[in-house]
From Swiss-Prot:
Belongs to the UPF0229 family. This is UPF0229 protein PP_0396. Residues 92-107 have a biased composition (Gly residues). It holds the Pfam family DUF444. InterPro entries: UPF0229. Residues 81-108 are annotated as: Disordered. Coiled coil: none annotated.
């Protein structure tokens, strides 16, 4: 029984390459549609893709054709409606399409082209051109960061890695090299035999000697093995170091009593978007969740997003806990440290200068990037202005933005994590 092994990269989906080419070609249309979808959908509603509409006029291929106007002399087949010398009226232009309008009895057009993108494609366009700023390659982090790559051909190796084409090529070259002289003698003997049979058919003695010589040469050639151990060639595979960056993201969320339910929902949506972004784009990254009111506590993912605990507001408690965790588990010499903080800006007045002091002296010198998002439609309070002073001192590694409504989440997120050009 024979077996067919499908080694195609695309498997049974023969249209994958065409689909990828189509997505590249209409990237701007798809990207715009994804941004509109994000603005109207819940951030937590990411389990499916999106329908994309492209105007029919944008998918037309450019063609060369006769322009409108002018006069043409064309011979048409005869019919019952027209006779010789009559003028055929020009077709009335019209542009149909997917727009809303009144019905008409003339003209034609093209509807919008609608297709579905998958969840993976949706997230790819959603997070395109976003990255963690200042991510630095620091250390090789163990054997699991090595990758196996082809490194040529070897004369020894595992039988499962034998290179059949190179092996047969080597065997063929060896047989040609070792039997070259015998084959040349065989050709000469064959020519001599043909000559004797034509010119001296009665010379049986010489004919018999030449035939014996031919048999001897053929036997010598056939004694050479078809395949020798010298011919075996193997694919050489080596482990190549794959430097990976160790990164940790601290997520600090204010859950104090001043945070209304709507404000908390916006904060949760922002962090859910951040969590999706990190998990999709960075394989080796850890996330630390910290909730705070008058006191701060490290929690797991479930409790961070869904716990109903609340209280007063002392923002510095979260910063102190973050600094302790950094010192204990994430030394700056080995880790790329990031932080994202969300609050409504309402803080105990005497605590805001303490927050600035902790950030500027104990946290900012060790982090790659720190973002602060203030969720409020009101005027900024003391915490915002203290953080502005930090932004002046660390312009490359500190950023702050304001959120007013859920519609601001995605634009602000893109602004905070927009890919920067290397300097």
């Amino acid at each position: 029984m024979s077996y067919v092994i499908d080694r195609r990269l695309n498997g049974k989906n023969k249209s994958t390459v065409n689909r990828q080419r189509f997505l590249r070609r209409y990237r701007e249309h798809i990207k715009k549609a994804v941004e509109e979808a994000v603005s109207r959908r819940s951030i937590m509603d990411m389990e499916h893709g999106e329908q994309i509409s492209i105007p029919g006029r944008d998918i037309d291929e450019p063609v060369l054709h006769h322009g409108r106007g002018g006069k043409q002399t064309i011979v048409h087949p005869g019919n019952k409606e027209f006779t010789a010398g009559e003028h055929i009226p020009r077709p009335q232009g019209g542009g149909g399409g997917g727009g809303r309008g009144k019905a008409g009895n003339s003209g034609e057009g093209m509807d919008e082209f609608v297709f579905q993108i998958t969840q993976e494609e949706f997230l790819e366009f959603m997070f395109e051109d976003l990255e963690l700023p200042n991510l630095v390659k620091r250390h090789l982090t163990g054997a699991d960061t090595f990758k196996t790559v082809r490194a040529g051909i070897a004369n020894e190796g595992n039988p499962s890695r034998i290179n059949i084409v190179r092996t047969l090529r080597s065997a063929h070259a060896r047989r040609i090299a070792l039997t070259g002289s015998s084959r040349a003698l065989l050709r000469e003997a064959q020519k001599e035999l043909d000559r004797l049979r034509v010119e001296e058919p009665d010379n049986f003695t010489d004919i018999q000697e030449v035939e014996q010589e031919i048999e001897r040469l053929k036997a010598r050639i056939n004694r050479l093995p078809f395949l020798d151990t010298f011919d075996l060639k193997y694919n050489l595979l080596v482990k190549q170091p794959n430097p990976s960056s160790k990164a940790v993201m601290f997520c600090l969320m204010d859950v104090s009593g001043s945070m209304t339910q709507a404000t908390k929902d916006i904060a949760k949506r922002f962090f859910i978007l951040l969590y999706l972004f990190l998990k999709r784009n960075y394989e080796r990254i850890e996330v630390v969740f910290i909730r705070h009111h008058t006191s701060a506590r490290e929690v797991d993912e479930e409790e961070f997003f869904y716990s109903r605990e609340t209280g007063g507001t002392i923002v510095s408690s979260a910063l102190k806990l973050m600094q302790e965790i950094m010192a204990e588990r994430y030394p700056a010499s080995d880790w790329n440290i990031y932080a994202a903080q969300a609050s409504d800006g309402d803080n105990w007045n005497d605590d805001s200068p303490i927050c600035r002091d902790i950030l500027s002296k104990q946290i900012m010198p060790h982090v790659q990037y720190y973002t602060y998002v203030e969720i409020t439609p009101r005027e900024h309070q003391a915490l915002w202005y203290e953080y502005e002073r930090i932004g002046d001192a660390f312009p490359d590694t500190f950023a702050q933005q304001q959120l007013v409504s859920a519609g601001d989440i995605y634009p602000v997120f893109r602004e905070l994590f927009q890919r920067r050009l290397a300097t």
